Curated annotation (Swiss-Prot):
Its main location: cytoplasm. This is Non-neuronal cytoplasmic intermediate filament protein B. Residues 25-47 have a biased composition (Low complexity). Residues 1-50 are annotated as: Disordered. Residues 121-258 are annotated as: Coil 1B.
Length: 450
């Protein structure tokens, strides 16, 4: 292609626009019922009819001046707009001359041979069509591959949803097991508190039993002491009885061994000693018997009272001891049952913890595998998306090149055909732009459908 440059000299061109004259008629203030007319040409020429100044007052003069200034500004604006229109007309005339020169240059180039250019463009078009066909086949394979990958992604998403539902079920089961473990721990804590209270009561009962046993031991020691004292008293009484018997035997022997009584005049000494000795022995015996009786009565009363108290205390202590033994036995039975239940709960708790740990490990393993699969398929999707974007970019580039070539070929074809209708460059450009817009729209529709 060749570029033709034209210059436009505004000074040597005669403008066909003639100066225009404007006639403006203004009505004066209504209060004065006066009117005036102004005639202004392009040279700003004005005239006022005589006799008008005589009818105007000072306020009318002020209004007239303001109106006059306003009219002047309007005329200046109109003159500026007119000058702008004139400049536009000059520019359009220059453009027309430039286009006419370019058209004349193109008509003069008809004799030149454009066959090599046409062949080159046809070869490029053939190569572009071949590349487009190859890209279309590659696009079909890529679309099939993408569809397969999308199906695989959908199946993997379903599998991920299944795993997520299973993990939710496992989490709910873990929460329920944790709540059950908490209930068991609360019950176990209650049982421990109950066992502690029962152990405290058992310790108190043991202390009471120890006190009762100490009291029994003290009472038994007192009983042994009283029994030994009673035995000693019996032994003492037996000794005194034997002593009395000894004294009786001694007296009898003395009576047998005594000499013949001396007869004192007026007094029988045998009878005297016999009566005195018998009296002394009787006094001693009576005093000893009284003392023995008093001691025996005291000992018997004390012994009987102690025996009665011991018997009543033993009965009461025996009942209390039996009750305490029954209570201790019952508490031991309950403690054994609670220990068995505690052992069972501890075993169950350990099994539940082991099951929870196993489920947690399984969930973490599934989550890890799921995350790895997700990362892998996201990478595959990203790679395929990048590849598809690159293919679409190449296809769009080739399509743009094809459309550009077709437009250039169409332009050269019209130039070579030599139309005599003298179509301007503007119509050719508009037609080319319309073809390019239609090609771009068809390419966009094709890309969206693919």
């Amino acid at each position: 292609t060749s570029k033709i440059s034209t210059t436009y000299e505004e000074e040597g061109r005669q403008s066909k626009i003639q100066p225009r004259a404007f006639v403006i008629t203004r009505s004066g203030p209504t209060s004065r019922s006066s009117s005036y007319s102004a005639r202004q040409s392009y040279g700003s020429r004005s005239s006022i009819t005589p006799g008008v100044y005589q009818q105007l007052s000072s306020s009318g003069i002020t209004d007239f001046r303001g109106t006059r200034e306003k009219e002047k500004r309007e005329m200046q604006n109109l003159n500026e707009r007119l000058a702008g229109y004139i400049e536009k007309v000059h520019f359009l005339d220059a453009q027309v001359k430039k286009l006419e020169a370019e058209n004349e240059a193109l008509r003069n180039r008809k004799s030149e041979s454009l066959q090599p250019i046409r062949d080159a463009y046809e070869n490029e078009l053939a190569q572009a069509r071949k590349v487009i066909d190859e890209l279309s086949s590659t696009k079909g394979v890529s679309e099939a591959k993408v569809a397969g990958l999308q199906d695989e992604i959908a199946s993997l998403r379903e599998l991920i949803g299944t795993y997520e539902n299973q993990s939710k079920d496992y989490r709910k089961k873990i929460e329920s097991l944790g709540n059950q473990i908490g209930e068991y721990e609360g019950e176990l804590h209650t049982l421990r508190i109950r066992c502690g209270s029962l152990e405290d009561e058992n310790a108190k009962v043991r202390e009471l039993l120890d006190k009762i046993q100490d009291q029994n031991r003290r009472l038994r020691a007192d009983l042994d002491t009283e029994t030994s004292a009673h035995i000693e008293a019996d032994c003492l009484a037996q000794t005194k009885t034997e002593e009395c018997e000894f004294y009786k035997d001694l007296l009898d022997q003395l009576e047998l061994l005594k000499p013949e009584p001396m007869q004192i005049k007026g007094m029988d000494y045998a009878e005297f000693w016999k009566s005195e000795l018998s009296k002394c022995v009787r006094d001693i015996q009576s005093a000893y018997d009284e003392k023995i009786d008093i001691i025996q009565q005291d000992i018997e009363a004390k012994y009987s009272s102690q025996i009665n108290s011991l018997r009543s205390g033993n009965v009461k202590d025996g009942m209390q001891l039996q009750h305490v033994q029954e209570e201790v036995k019952k508490l031991r039975t309950q403690a054994g049952e609670k220990n068995a239940a505690y052992a069972e709960l501890a075993a169950k708790f350990a099994s539940l913890q082991a099951e929870r740990d196993a489920i947690g490990r399984q969930c973490s393993e599934l989550e890890r595998e799921l995350e790895e699969l997700r990362i892998k398929y996201n990478q595959d999707i990203g790679d395929l998306s990048n590849e598809l974007s690159a293919v679409l970019a190449q296809l769009q580039t080739l399509t743009d090149v094809k459309i550009t070539m077709e437009l250039e070929i169409a332009c050269y074809r019209k130039l070579l055909e030599g139309e005599e209708s003298r179509v301007g460059l503007r119509s050719l450009v508009e037609q080319a732009i319309g073809v390019q817009g239609r090609g771009t729209a068809s390419l966009k529709d094709t890309i969206q459908q693919s």
